């Protein structure tokens, strides 16, 4: 079976481990770039899905949506600075996700939503705990669409001090391995249900 991972740098960090863990069970592919915010997803999703047949699509958007930017969207801005704003406000995020879900459902693949991992204090260009609101919005979309959730946020939180870099949304190599264990097990579970 063919599995597609869609996500940002967090998914880039766990892809190789997931591929290794699912060796012999699934061929694990990942989009060729950082998925960025949902707005970027909407621009590129058709190209990422291509004409291939996917059995499972494990997807996340969030950390780039809840990022603060100013004039230059490629740079993070201080959330408290005048003129800084969320890259994708919450209501738009929810709407964009619903649209992305429709486009992915059209492939006939089994979809798995991976929720957004924790934003710690002192993380550049983001507000601590903002992932909670975004995950709640995403949960509404996924519940309505009947899509299961890989609760990577709770998994990360269980060992956050050990696995996440200080004041940073990213993880250590062993931290990515820890995330990969959860991702691989959720994908394996869903492959057996197909």
Model region roles, listed by residue range:
Residues 1-16, 37, 64-66:
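Catalytic nucleophile-elbow at a beta strand-turn-alpha helix junction centered on a G-D-S/GDSL motif
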Residues 20-27, 39-193:
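Alpha-helical cap/lid subdomain in secreted, periplasmic
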Residues 30-37:
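Short beta->alpha junction loops
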């Amino acid at each position: 079976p063919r599995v597609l991972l869609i996500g940002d740098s967090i998914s880039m960090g766990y892809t190789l481990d997931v591929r290794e863990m699912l060796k012999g069970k699934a061929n694990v592919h990942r989009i060729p770039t950082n998925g960025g915010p949902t707005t970027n997803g909407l621009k590129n999703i058709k190209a990422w899905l291509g004409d291939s047949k996917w059995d499972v699509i494990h997807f996340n958007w969030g950390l780039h949506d809840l990022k603060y930017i100013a004039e230059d969207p490629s740079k993070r801005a201080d959330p408290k600075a005048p003129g800084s704003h969320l890259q994708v406000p919450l209501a738009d995020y929810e709407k964009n996700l619903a649209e992305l879900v429709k486009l992915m459902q059209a492939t006939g693949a089994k979809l798995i939503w991976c929720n957004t991992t924790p934003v710690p204090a002192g993380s550049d260009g983001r507000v601590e705990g903002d992932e909670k609101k975004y995950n709640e919005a995403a949960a509404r979309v996924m519940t309505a669409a009947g899509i299961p959730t890989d609760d990577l946020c709770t998994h990360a939180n269980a060992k956050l001090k050990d696995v996440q870099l200080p004041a940073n949304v990213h993880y250590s190599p062993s931290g990515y391995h820890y995330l990969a264990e959860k991702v691989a097990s959720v994908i394996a579970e869903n492959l057996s249900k197909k």
